[in-house]
Amino acid sequence: LAKLERLCAAADILGCAFIRGFAFFAPEEGPLPAETLAPYFERPVRLLEQRGKTLLLEADPSVNTSNHAALARLVEAIGSPRVRAIFDPGNCLYDPLGETPYPDGYEAIRPFFAHVHIKDAVRAVPESYCVKVGTGQVGYPALLRRLAADGYAGWLSMETHYRLDSHLTEEQMRLPGGAGFSAGGAAATAESVAALKDILQKE
C-alpha cells in the first residue's frame, strides 16, 4: 500500500491518471482465482478513490492473471471503476493456457481495458520470443481495425521486448531492468515504431 501511495504521488507530479500494476506473482502451485484475489484490492481501491487515480492491471504469465480472460474475471470481481485493465496482445503469446491475442483476448477484456500495449511475439517451444511489430502472431492489422471500429481513443504504448540481434531471457522479461535489459532497445524500438506507423497508414 505504501508503494501505491508513492506511485500516486509520482503520478501527481507527472500529471498521470493511470497507474500500471499486476495481480501479484502466482504461487508455485498455480494461480489464485479471482474470488480469492479480489479482497486484496479493497484497501488499494480506497486509496485510489482518495487520490483520484485508476489502477490498470496487466495480464502476464508470471502473475495470477496469465491471460485476459482471467484478468477480466478479476476486474469484474473487484467491481470498482478505479481498477481497469491494460490490453497487451503480445503477452497472450506467452500465456501457458494459449490464449489467442485476437479475437479471444480482445473480446475477453474489451469491457474493461483503458490502455493498449504494443509488442509482437511468436509462440514457440521451449520459449516464446518477441519480434518486430507486424511480423509475429498478434495479427495487428485486424486488431487495429477493430480498435478503430470500436472507437478506442486511448494510447498505443510501445513495449519493446524485441531486440534486433538477440532475445531477452525469461527472467529479463519477468523482472525488466538494468543495462542488460536495455541494451539494443533503442534500435529495436525505432524499427517497431516505424513498422506500427506503416501498418496504421495502410489500415
What are these regions (language model features)?
Residues L1-F87, A179, A183-A186:
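Active-site acidic/histidine proton-transfer and metal-coordination neighborhood
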Residues A9, G15, H68-E203:
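Histidine-acidic metal/acid-base catalytic patches
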